Amino acid sequence: MKKTLRFAAVVSSLAASAALLVAAPAAAQALGSQGAQLADEVVAVVNNDVITGRELDQRVGLIARRLQQQNAPVPPADQLRAQVLNQMVLERIQVQKAKDDGIRIDDATVQATLQRLAQANGMTLDQYRGRLEAQGVPWSIFTNDARTELMLSKLREREVDGKITVSDAEVANYIASQRGPNASQQQDLRFQHIFIKAPTNAPQADIEAAQKKADALLQQAKSGADFERLAKNNSEANDAKKGGDLGFKSPSALPADVVDAASKLRPGQVNPTLIRVPDGFEIVRLVDRRQSQGASAAAPKIVQTHVRHILLRVGEGKSEGQARQQLVDIRNQVEAGGDFAKFARTYSQDGSASQGGDLGWISPGETVPEFERAMNNLQDGQISQPIRTEYGYHLIQVLNRREAEGSVQQQMDIARQAIGQRKAEQAYADWLRELRDSSYVQYKIGGVGPAN
């Protein structure tokens, strides 16, 4: 599970790089001439290595472009450069550590990762490379970024994630704490929320920009602005179109910080502070409370997805390109009013074809990772682009979602994953701080120093 999650993070980071590399030069130029003056100078010494002004300029351009795409304010040039340089120093230290420890990423592994990234975008590798190069992204730079991401992921797995253990006692205590001593008296909670993305492993500049954006939205919400409209226009969660309405949920299905906030709120009130969650910042408004239906209502919940698909297998006279294009054509026809179930019965090549491709209610972990990631990114009723898995190409449509109390094993798995993720994030932060403290770093430009 850990390796699957780390790979997803690698793919996500590379996808962001692909989108941003296109406009890096223009964004860097927009920050003024300061960077150009430093292009050939050393801006930081990191152990036996250096970071040049040219490298810094390129990264600043990427971050500035990302902020612009998110409609987030771009910090002043000096502040942004300092934040980005600190992030580059941390990255360089980790790369050095990985190389010293003998971590190598061979070409085959890089190619396999790029292949999966291309498939996630519904393309062959050649098509994906062609699109990037047509947009001005040198393939060699993108490939090198992929190698670095994989190297750092492997280093973290070895130094941190692989050492995290979660005991059965911790799992039992977690489940018991979620139920609480008075589970039969607990209340279900109905929230609206606004979610602003800012993963804990994102560049510090991104996190600070996301927090600034979230703070501004929080002030509007506290001042009486229409929360539903704020959520629809700004939230980055899948339920944004619903005004951020989460519906009624048991306390066990919500982050602990959200439940804690609810204890201090009356219906209609907005929590006065941002809530930090692993993937970003939450602004929450308590809509209502209701009595839970007994102790079982407080048990850890899972989100099940009602989904259907069309599968086309590759081989036996059907190439990758043919399978993908056929699904693109089917998708276009369904979007124009065609019957998904009818197409599934006619063309799908798995056992669900006779049911119109209906797979029923799917719980987390019951499908292959590529299918599950695509499914989780879809809104109700939305249809995916062709998705490649080991079985072939899929066209996926989400019909509905629901909360359900998982089996005992599923509840234990949820608890183990939550505990492990919390432990890993804290351990990684501690390890990275120790690694930074044991390294020699000298900044060569004014106004820059170690991040707090």
Swiss-Prot record:
It catalyses: [protein]-peptidylproline (omega=180) = [protein]-peptidylproline (omega=0). Keywords: Chaperone, Isomerase, Periplasm, Repeat, Rotamase, Signal. One of its GO terms (molecular function) is peptide binding. It holds the Pfam family Rotamase_3. The keyword rRNA-binding does not apply. GO terms for biological process: Gram-negative-bacterium-type cell outer membrane assembly; protein folding; protein stabilization. The keyword RNA-binding does not apply. Its EC number is 5.2.1.8. SUPFAM superfamilies: FKBP-like (SSF54534), Triger factor/SurA peptide-binding domain-like (SSF109998). It is found in: Periplasm. Its main location: periplasm. Residues 186-288, 302-400 form the PpiC domain. InterPro entries: OMP_Chaperone_SurA, PPIase_dom_sf, PPIase_PpiC, PPIase_SurA, SurA_N, Trigger_fact/SurA_dom_sf. GO terms for cellular component: outer membrane-bounded periplasmic space. Residues 1-28 form the signal peptide. Chaperone involved in the correct folding and assembly of outer membrane proteins. Recognizes specific patterns of aromatic residues and the orientation of their side chains, which are found more frequently in integral outer membrane proteins. May act in both early periplasmic and late outer membrane-associated steps of protein maturation. The PPIase activity resides only in the second parvulin domain. The N-terminal region and the C-terminal tail are necessary and sufficient for the chaperone activity of SurA. The PPIase activity is dispensable for SurA to function as a chaperone. The N-terminal region and the C-terminal tail are also required for porin recognition. HAMAP family: Chaperone_SurA. This is Chaperone SurA. The gene is surA.
